[in-house]
Swiss-Prot record:
One of its GO terms (biological process) is proton transmembrane transport. The keyword Isomerase does not apply. It holds the Pfam family V_ATPase_I. One of its GO terms (molecular function) is proton-transporting ATPase activity, rotational mechanism. It comes from the Eukaryota. Belongs to the V-ATPase 116 kDa subunit family. This is V-type proton ATPase subunit a, Golgi isoform. Residues 113-154, 297-347 form a coiled coil. The modification Phosphoserine is found at residues 223, 228. The keyword Secreted does not apply. Residues 1-450, 489-502, 601-618, 703-779, 868-890 are cytoplasmic. Present with 1084 molecules/cell in log phase SD medium.
């Protein structure tokens, strides 16, 4: 199909209406999603999301999406175990890749409601089984971990008791029993508890070992009598065993020591294997605590619980308990292995179906979300939206073919509607122009049929960047980086990209042109890594004889063929010359950029057939701009082209000339050309006349036309309002006639009945005050912007100067020092060269290419968004976003 380019202006759009029977509503909607040409308008804006027709279906697929997400989490959770069972290589030895989600969504055939219901039932059953097996597996692992932990605690504590049998003895001692009764009756006040906890967490206090009492271990310096006393006094019924995190052992010991006033024996043993706690493995210690009295025993248990420790009961028959635990562990391990194998088998089946389920769920949700925008009727739904005019025939033919496959009992009505509603803006782009169009769209979407600022941006954006970045070496590095992205765009396009890299990859063609233009401007500036190139013969000749320390002057012998003469580099007045050149070049570039941008406003006015804007805005604005800044630009070129040395005259200063043109009209300090005073007065008067012209003509003309009955034309747009468009619609209607199941309504017959519902109506009553205020703001803004925007282009000179000076400083600090060694052949000098070169290259790429490049790019954005686009860009449109399954992936 021969499509309209739609680059200079947006594509022609047509408003259409579809009446779709309920029996085929899903199938037709799927077809529209695959065609990606129909921008659906919301006909139910007055309804909330819960009042729309397909809210129950959306809720259902929200639940299905949750199930698919859970299944995906379970598959990823057990990916390491199931990976070895998944087929990764086909019969030919090629890797089997996972199906791409975008391809699945675009290529999957529409499913019937019966198939969708079967798939949803299958997802529900799989989710239920996977959830049950996964929860059972986690529960079994937790129980197995508890048994292993319990066995380790019993083993370690029993071994300790066997080594110290007297500690667990049950000998009686009247004094100890009386002490136990006293402790049981002991009660602590809130102040005592606060003081005890404060002491417990004060690690500067004396430790149990410092006090000479029983701490973590039985101290070596204890006497036999003391140890015997302990063995007789501490009872087995006041023993607590358990486990706790290794990081909390010392905290537990100190808290209990302070809280029980030293009335305990505490011993801990490390557990070698990490144990599962929640979803992570942690290192733990088992402990054994001896105390006396039920009250202290309860306090110990509460402290252990507060620190998330586990208490394990230990009786005298530890060997029997260990045997019982071993049998339980073996039985539980067999059950766990069986459950795990069953789950992995289930996940293998789910793994193959997950991409299809996910694609189906996303697509069904997207379809029902779109169906909620349709207007419901008794036997069908009405859909309205915008279609590119060049796609109408394609849309009709596709609907015709599809309806024929379904049978003649179904009919879809296709109406082309006249409307004054503002159509969406649609610029056809490719992978090269897309990034440049995105630069413009980021600032604002062009109004329908407005000049596309993105077309000129393809050239002006990289060129403005290159003027500021102008270095052949740095530009070549940037060009190579972008070229690498371009040559490997298929590889990088398929991989997952982070946000930073995605921006660079998306703008790879912008970076490519930025680098190429920078190489060109680097040749113009004769600058490569802050050094000059002797490509051609210099136009200056230095004297052959001179004395050391003497200032010498070069004689001009010709004109350098291309760019700046390398003889200027390194001279005392080289910076003065380059500053003057780049400053004037910035003014010329700004004048050219703003002038052609302002010309676009004339094309916009002409396209809208708005004579009042051409006469009242464009002409006075153009005269005002050219009278001042056009004259300044001409004076710069004239001053450059005139041989002032031959005329034996000093070159006049243009800054003073421009200032005197306003402050002292007719006064000339240094004459630039004959008749200069009279011409400047005429230009100044022309600029002054343009101000009231710009201010008053449009409001007064609109007021006069309104009084005479010539105003009141609606601001809206008619999509088939011109002859060519009507002929095209007639041709499309004729081509669509004669097939069953598709009805093309007459355009004129539906225009009157539909126009009110979709159109914007006519313009309101004329308000001279509003128009006048708007024009006053426009006049002040335009006049001030002409001055400020011209000065803003001096950033081209400023950034170019900063870039050149920074590059020169970096060279002098690194490479220049590397080759200034006295012993150039020594190993130290060689190492110095290698190190300083690496340092220079890294700093060049990081600072001069990345950082300075980013700065220059942002300034180039500013020059386009503000200085250039403000001259013509309205930006009151909205983007054309067709109903497309590609939007699901994006």
């Amino acid at each position: 199909m021969n499509q309209e380019e739609a680059i200079f202006r947006s594509a022609d759009m047509t408003y259409v209406q579809l009446y779709i029977p309920l029996e085929v509503i899903r199938e037709v909607t799927f077809l529209l999603g695959k065609m990606s040409v129909f921008m659906v308008m919301d006909l139910n804006k007055d309804l909330t999301a819960f009042q729309r027709g397909y809210v129950n279906q959306l809720r259902r697929f929200d639940e299905v999406e949750r199930m698919v997400g859970f299944l995906n989490e379970v598959v990823e959770k057990h990916a390491a175990e199931t990976w070895k069972y998944i087929l990764h290589i086909d019969d030919e030895g090629n890797d089997i890749a996972q199906p791409d989600m975008a391809d699945l969504i675009n290529t999957m055939e529409p499913l019937s409601l019966e198939n969708v219901n079967d798939m949803v039932k299958e997802i529900t059953d799989c989710e239920s089984r996977a959830r049950q097996l996964d929860e059972s597996l986690d529960s079994l692992r937790s129980k197995l971990n508890d048994l292993l932990e319990q066995r380790q605690v019993i083993f370690e504590c029993s071994k300790f008791i066997e080594v110290n049998p007297g500690i667990a003895g049950r000998a009686t001692n009247p004094e100890i029993e009386q002490e136990e009764r006293d402790v049981d009756e002991f009660r602590m006040t809130p102040d005592d508890i606060s003081e005890t906890l404060s002491d417990a967490f004060s690690f500067d206090d004396e430790t149990p070992q410092d006090r000479g009492a029983l701490g973590n271990d039985l101290t070596r310096n204890q006497s036999v009598e003391d140890l015997s006393f302990l063995e007789q006094g501490y009872q087995h019924r006041y023993m607590i065993t358990g486990s706790i995190r290794r990081t909390k052992v010392d905290i537990l010991n100190r808290i209990l020591w302070r809280l029980l006033r030293g009335n305990l024996i505490f011993q801990n043993f490390p557990i070698e294997e990490p144990l599962l706690e929640g979803k992570e493995k942690v290192e733990k210690d088992c402990f054994i605590i001896f105390t006396h009295g039920e009250t202290l025993l309860k306090k110990v248990k509460r402290v252990i619980d507060s620190l998330n420790g586990k208490i394990v009961s230990l009786n005298t028959r530890s060997s029997e308990l260990v045997d019982t635990l071993n049998r339980q562990i073996d039985d539980l391990q067999r059950i766990l292995d069986t459950t795990e194998q069953t789950l992995h088998t289930e996940l293998l089946v789910i793994h193959d179906q997950l991409p299809v389920w996910s694609a189906m769920t996303k697509r069904e949700k997207y379809v029902y979300t779109t169906l909620n925008k349709f207007q419901q009727e008794s036997q069908g739904l009405i859909a309205e939206g915008w279609v590119p005019s060049t796609e109408l025939i394609h849309l009709q033919d596709s609907l015709k073919d599809y309806i024929e496959t379904l049978g003649s009992e179904y009919s879809t009505v296709f109406n082309v509607i006249l409307t004054n509603k503002l159509p969406p803006t649609y610029h056809r782009t490719n992978k090269f122009t897309q990034a440049f169009q995105s630069i413009v769209d980021a600032y604002g979407i062009a109004t329908y049929k407005e000049i596309n600022a993105g077309l000129a941006t393809v050239v002006t954006f990289p060129f403005m960047f290159a003027i500021m970045f102008g270095d052949m070496g740095h530009g070549f590095i940037l060009f190579l980086m972008a070229l690498f992205l371009v040559l490997n765009e298929r590889k990088f396009g398929a991989m997952h990209r982070d946000e930073i890299f995605d921006m660079a990859f998306t703008g790879r063609y912008v970076l490519l042109l930025m680098g190429a233009f920078s190489v060109y401007t680097g040749l113009l500036y004769n600058d490569i890594f802050s050094k000059s190139m002797t490509i051609f013969k210099s136009g200056w000749q230095w004297p052959s004889t001179f004395r050391k320390g003497e200032s010498i002057e070069a004689k001009k012998t010709g004109v350098y063929p291309f760019g700046l003469d390398f003889a200027w580099h390194g001279t005392d007045n080289g910076l003065l010359f380059s500053n003057s050149y780049k400053m004037k070049l910035s003014i010329l570039m700004g004048y050219a950029h703003m002038t052609y941008s302002f010309m676009f406003s004339y094309i916009n006015y002409r396209a809208k057939n708005s004579k009042v804007d051409i006469i009242g805005n464009f002409i006075p604005g153009l005269v005002f701009m050219q009278s001042i800044f056009g004259y300044l630009s001409w004076a710069i070129v004239y001053k450059w082209s005139k041989d002032w040395i031959k005329d034996d005259k000093p070159a006049p200063g243009l800054l003073n000339m421009l200032i005197n043109m306003f402050l002292a009209p007719g006064t000339i300090d240094d004459q630039l050309y004959s008749g200069q005073a009279k011409l400047q007065v005429v230009l100044l008067l022309a600029a002054l006349v343009c101000v009231p012209w710009l201010l008053l003509y449009k409001p007064l003309t609109l007021r006069r036309l309104n009084k005479n009955g010539g105003g009141g034309r609606p601001h809206g747009y008619q999509s088939v309002g011109n002859i060519e468009h009507e002929e095209q619609i007639a041709q499309q209607r004729h081509s669509a006639e004669g097939f069953q199941g598709m009805i093309i309504s007459d355009v004129a017959s539906v225009a009157d009945s539909i126009n009110e519902s979709v159109g914007g109506g006519e313009q309101g009553p004329f308000n001279f005050g509003d128009v006048m205020i708007h024009q006053v703001i426009h006049t002040i803004e335009f006049c001030l912007n002409c001055i400020s925007h011209t000065a803003s282009y001096l950033r081209l000179w400023a950034l170019s100067l900063a870039h050149a000076q920074l590059s020169s400083v970096l060279w002098d600090m690194t490479i220049s020092n590397a080759f200034s060694s006295k012993n150039s052949g020594s190993p130290l000098a060689v190492m110095k060269v290698v190190f300083l070169f690496a340092m220079w290259f890294v700093l060049t790429v990081c600072i001069l290419v990345f950082m300075e490049g980013t700065s220059a790019m942002l300034h180039a954005l500013r020059l386009h968004w503000v200085e250039a686009m403000s001259k013509f860009f309205e930006g009151e449109g909205y983007a054309y976003e067709p109903f497309s399954f590609r939007a699901i992936i994006e």
